[in-house]
Amino acid sequence: SGDAELLSLFVLPPCRHQEIGTRLLHAVGQVLKEQQCRQVSVIYEVTPLTTAALEPMLHKLGWQPPQLAFLLMDTTMERIKQAPWLEKYPLSDFSGGDVFPWGDYAETDRQQVDLLEWEPELSPFRDPERLERLNSLGLRYREQLIGWIVTHRVALDQIRYSSLFVAERFRTKARGISLLSAAIRLQIASPVVKATCAVAADNAAMLRFGRRHLQPYLTGLRELRQSRLEIVLESEKKPI
């Protein structure tokens, strides 16, 4: 019951163009209906294959028109170190501010996380076994936690910038950019040469920043789109 997520749909190349994928996807919908599931969603990377094959299939089966879900941004330290904003908002100018390694957060910091208003996807406690201690940082103001940037090692030579949060009253002072810059500078000084991040489509401020200040220094920019199918259960069908 509840909602479902489609994780993978694949048809061998020699067997394509025979509506096998369409029949598989339709069968998934029928099984979910029997299990009283009300909605199924899919998130996928935009490629020539998904544009030519998956999106027409979703349309044919009554899925909602795909919408942008995330922008995936890739860069290297050689490229990003050219960004002028890296030195524009140093945390050393933040009177009363204290930057610390997130891997060393105190129990009081953990308690204060719950007092801040942040979206679930920005949790600093996700994927702890891959936490990158090199440049995961916390930010306090007068001993109160006000933000964090959490990164994860996703490959030997690549760090993912997973979560960036600053309490709302400090955002007008560009403290988020300050934290991001500090983390990037730490990576630039390390042997880890690649970085990646995903920006949610509903994070308007970060999308603007990414397109204006990150995009000129990227090595790759990819889209993830999302589509949903609302499932009408038999018990909810109106009599004719």
Where are these regions (language model features)?
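Conserved acetyl-CoA-binding loop-helix of GNAT-fold acetyltransferases
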Residues: 11, 17-34, 166, 172-187, ...
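Conserved GNAT acetyl-CoA-binding A-motif
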Residues: 32-47, 187-201
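A conserved beta-strand-loop-helix scaffold within acyl/acetyltransferase catalytic domains
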Residues: 1-4, 9, 117-168
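Short amphipathic alpha-helix that is part of the acyltransferase structural core
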Residues: 83-123, 239-240
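N-terminal-biased segments
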Residues: 3-17, 105, 109-116
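Structured beta->alpha junctions
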Residues: 10-13, 46, 165-168, 199
